[in-house]
């Protein structure tokens, strides 16, 4: 049962070497004499992948050759053919058979979990290690024979290979460390540049926000300024309209002032004429009063009354003529005798006594009226100036006539 299971568990490449197994120096301690190997490395590969031995260092060494193809390898059957055993010098240039065995066993062991992850090694290292292993296999094939011990040579060769392998691993580690340091420095540099770029980006973002804030503030100021300009334009338009109205009012007021000035000049001229006429009448009345008083003192009343009547008629005659009365008293011949009756003399004496007390008062009133007429008109008196000027001369004209009548 166990033998059948063992036969089923064998790999296909093991059956191809059963015929030449007797010529190989090394045999598998688990499989027996029917499984033999030409070199120690092939035996280790067989033990590693076919049995339960777990030698990590050997696995690491064997895993350096996964890229080699089976078509490039030379099988042990081809090496053991007649005519091939004598040409041991050419075997060094060919690939060993244990590498082929390792590749085949590795293909059959893909379903199982690998022991460890193997790092990639340089091609020069693979070539050097392969050449050294081939050289060792060739030496082993030439020297090995049935009954010849080669353990010392194998041990020294393996020590040499381990030492060289360790040196190469150290060199590779140093190279990897250098590259890691270089990449670390580049990463630090890129990180610093990235931080600088990020800081610049943050700064530019802040500046952009500040510019946007200023833009919004300026937009608000511009809006306020536009509104103020619109209000000022409206006020300016209203001011211009008001100014035009004021100018029109000023022009109208100037025309009014010109008309008022013309009327004032005319009024002053009329007033001056009236004052001159009034002064003449006052002077004439004073002369008549003086003459009347002088005649009363001398006692010649009759002659004085006749003289006064003749003077009055002579003074009133041009006035009546100027007024255009055709039927005046002075021109009527039948009424002249009415002023000289004897019954009128006593009445005239009483009137003369009363009139002697009133000349000063009349003169004072006339002076006040002339002062009022000469007074400059005020603002409120501009419109009524012509009317007042027309009323006062009429009143002044009535006073001399009354005085004359009293006399």
Curated annotation (Swiss-Prot):
What do we know about what induces or represses this protein's expression? Induced by gamma irradiation and zeocin.
Q: Where in the cell is it found?
A: Cytoplasm, Cytoskeleton, Microtubule organizing center, Centrosome
Q: Per the database entry, which stretches of residues form a coiled coil?
A: 169-297
Q: Which UniProt keywords apply?
A: Coiled coil, Cytoplasm, Cytoskeleton, Metal-binding, Neurogenesis, Phosphoprotein, Zinc, Zinc-finger
Recorded hits in InterPro entries, A to Z, give: FBX41/ZN365_Znf-C2H2 (IPR057038), GenomicStab_NeuMorph_Reg (IPR052283)
Zinc finger (C2H2-type) residue ranges?
26-51
Tissue localization of expression: Isoform 1 is expressed in brain. Isoform 2 is expressed in placenta and at low level in lung and liver. Isoform 3 is expressed in kidney and pancreas. Isoform 1 is expressed exclusively in brain.
Give the UniProt record's GO annotations in the biological process aspect: cerebellar molecular layer morphogenesis; dendrite arborization; dendritic spine morphogenesis; negative regulation of neuron projection development; positive regulation of oligodendrocyte differentiation; regulation of DNA strand resection involved in replication fork processing; regulation of double-strand break repair via homologous recombination; regulation of neuron projection development
One of the Pfam families matching this protein, by short name: zf-C2H2_FBX41
Residue list for modification Phosphoserine: 16, 138, 369
Q: Which domain of life is it from?
A: Eukaryota
| Keyword Ribosomal protein annotated | no
Q: Name one GO cellular component term.
A: centrosome
Which residues are annotated with the PTM Phosphothreonine?
A: 175
Alphabetically, the GO molecular function entries are: identical protein binding; zinc ion binding
Region Disordered, as annotated, extends over: 347-392
Subunit relationships:
Homodimer. Interacts with NDE1 and NDEL1. Does not interact with TUBG1. Interacts with DISC1. Interacts with PARP1. Interacts with MCRS1.
Record's miscellaneous remark: Cells silencing ZNF365 display delayed mitotic progression and exit, due to increased replication stress, and ultimately leading to cytokinesis failure, re-duplication of centrosomes and increased aneuploidy.
The protein's job, in short, is:
Involved in the regulation of neurogenesis. Negatively regulates neurite outgrowth. Involved in the morphogenesis of basket cells in the somatosensory cortex during embryogenesis. Involved in the positive regulation of oligodendrocyte differentiation during postnatal growth. Involved in dendritic arborization, morphogenesis of spine density dendrite, and establishment of postsynaptic dendrite density in cortical pyramidal neurons. Involved in homologous recombination (HR) repair pathway. Required for proper resolution of DNA double-strand breaks (DSBs) by HR.
Designated name of the protein: Protein ZNF365
Phylogenetic lineage: Eukaryota, Metazoa, Chordata, Craniata, Vertebrata
């Amino acid at each position: 049962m166990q033998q059948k299971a063992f036969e089923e568990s064998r790999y296909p490449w093991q059956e191809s070497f059963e015929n030449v197994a007797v010529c190989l120096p090394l045999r598998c301690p688990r499989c027996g004499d029917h499984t033999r190997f030409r070199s120690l490395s092939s035996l280790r590969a067989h033990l590693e992948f076919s049995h339960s031995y777990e030698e990590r260092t050997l696995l690491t060494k064997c895993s350096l050759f996964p890229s080699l193809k089976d078509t490039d390898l030379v099988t042990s059957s081809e090496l053991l053919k007649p005519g091939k055993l004598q040409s041991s010098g050419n075997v060094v240039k060919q690939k060993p058979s244990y590498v082929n065995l390792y590749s085949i066993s590795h293909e059959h062991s893909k379903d199982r979990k690998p022991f460890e992850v193997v790092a990639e090694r340089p091609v020069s290292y693979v070539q050097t290690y392969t050449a050294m292993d081939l050289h060792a296999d060739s030496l082993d094939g030439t020297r090995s024979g049935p009954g010849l011990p080669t353990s010392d040579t194998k041990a020294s060769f393996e020590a040499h290979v381990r030492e060289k392998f360790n040196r190469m691993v150290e060199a590779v580690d140093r190279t990897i460390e250098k590259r890691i340091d270089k990449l670390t420095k580049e990463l630090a540099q890129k990180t610093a540049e990235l931080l600088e770029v990020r800081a610049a980006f943050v700064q530019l973002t802040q500046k952009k926000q500040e510019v946007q804030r200023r833009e919004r503030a300026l937009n608000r100021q511009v809006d306020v300024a536009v509104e103020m300009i619109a209000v000022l334009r409206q006020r300016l338009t209203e001011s211009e309209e008001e100014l035009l109205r004021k100018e029109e009012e000023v022009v109208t007021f100037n025309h009014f002032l010109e008309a008022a000035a013309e009327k004032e000049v005319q009024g002053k001229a009329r007033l001056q004429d009236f004052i001159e006429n009034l002064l003449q009448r006052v002077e004439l009345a004073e002369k008549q009063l003086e003459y009347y008083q002088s005649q009363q003192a001398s006692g010649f009343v009759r002659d004085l009354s006749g003289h006064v009547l003749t003077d009055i008629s002579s003074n009133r005659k041009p006035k009546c003529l100027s007024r255009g009365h055709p039927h005046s008293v002075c021109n009527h011949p039948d009424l002249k005798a009415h002023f000289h009756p004897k019954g009128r003399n006593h009445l005239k004496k009483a009137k003369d006594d009363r009139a002697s007390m009133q000349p000063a008062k009349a003169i004072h009133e006339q002076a006040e009226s002339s002062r009022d007429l000469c007074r400059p008109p005020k603002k409120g008196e501009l419109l009524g100036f012509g009317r007042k000027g027309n009323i006062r001369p009429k009143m002044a004209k009535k006073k001399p006539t009354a005085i004359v009548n009293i006399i």
